[in-house]
């Protein structure tokens, strides 16, 4: 079966190179080699899953409202109206995909994952197997309503309404949404699928969380530096049996966007 994929990016205030400040070197599993050409990193993000789940109701409200459920045709003259759309089911397995992807786009804002693979490879990693799927991503929207208003793309033409068409796609039956705050920016991900995997409720994660084992392709790393605090100094002399606390050191990786 041919699988559809959508590459939709809301770019806002992204004219910068993302800097990954990793956890202290004393933290187990901080940075390690993965497969050839990739590296595993761990980062701390603050999840906002209560806000993320608020977007879910907004999407279904849009699908139910006949005055909202439309998009421009390719000619930008006529509209397609999406009648009798069924509400999407909130899928907690898809939410796990979206949460992982939200952390990943904080490092590399793209539908391509930091390890160089397509976004949908994250589905099977979380037990989601869909024939039709799509992803919407957004950055620097501090609230659920601000994100959704941008994703609606009310004033865009056909080429600019990809996110809108994803939300109104009759093939989709499930959605999961992720939201993280990292280095001063809010990152949001909406994952859509034509299958429902898990509907059992889970408590929303609104905590600062360590996300482990994010793979980054070596080709995406533009610089790699060990930062040593001044209290340790640039030169260390040790005697046999002596120990030195290096927990203040960390690795600073610059990742191309």
Segment roles from a protein language model:
Residues 34-126, 164, 170-175:
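Short, well-ordered surface patches within globular domains
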Residues 198-223, 227, 244:
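Ser/Thr/Gly/Pro-rich low-complexity, disordered linker/stalk segments of secreted
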């Amino acid at each position: 079966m041919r699988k559809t994929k959508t590459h939709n990016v809301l770019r806002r205030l992204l004219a910068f190179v993302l800097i990954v400040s990793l956890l202290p070197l004393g933290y187990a599993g901080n940075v390690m080699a993965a497969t050839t050409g990739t590296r595993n990193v761990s980062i701390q993000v603050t999840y906002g899953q209560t806000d993320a789940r608020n977007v879910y109701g907004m999407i279904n409200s849009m699908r139910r409202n006949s005055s909202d459920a439309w998009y421009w045709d390719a000619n930008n003259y006529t509209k397609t109206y999406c009648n009798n759309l069924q509400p999407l089911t909130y899928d907690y397995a898809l939410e796990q995909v979206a949460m992982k992807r939200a952390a990943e786009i904080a490092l590399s804002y793209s539908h391509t994952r930091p390890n160089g693979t397509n976004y949908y490879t994250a589905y099977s990693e979380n037990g989601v197997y869909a024939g039709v799927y799509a992803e919407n991503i957004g950055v620097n929207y501090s609230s659920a309503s601000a994100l959704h208003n941008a994703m609606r793309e009310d004033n865009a033409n056909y080429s600019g309404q990809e996110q809108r068409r994803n939300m109104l796609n009759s093939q989709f039956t499930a959605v999961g949404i992720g939201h993280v705050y990292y280095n001063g920016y809010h990152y949001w991900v909406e994952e859509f699928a034509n299958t429902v995997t898990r509907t059992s409720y889970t408590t929303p994660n609104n905590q600062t969380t360590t996300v482990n084992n994010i793979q980054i392709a070596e080709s995406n790393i533009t610089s790699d530096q060990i930062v040593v605090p001044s209290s340790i100094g640039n030169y260390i002399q040790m005697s046999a049996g002596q120990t030195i606390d290096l927990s203040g050191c960390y690795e600073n990786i610059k990742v191309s966007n």
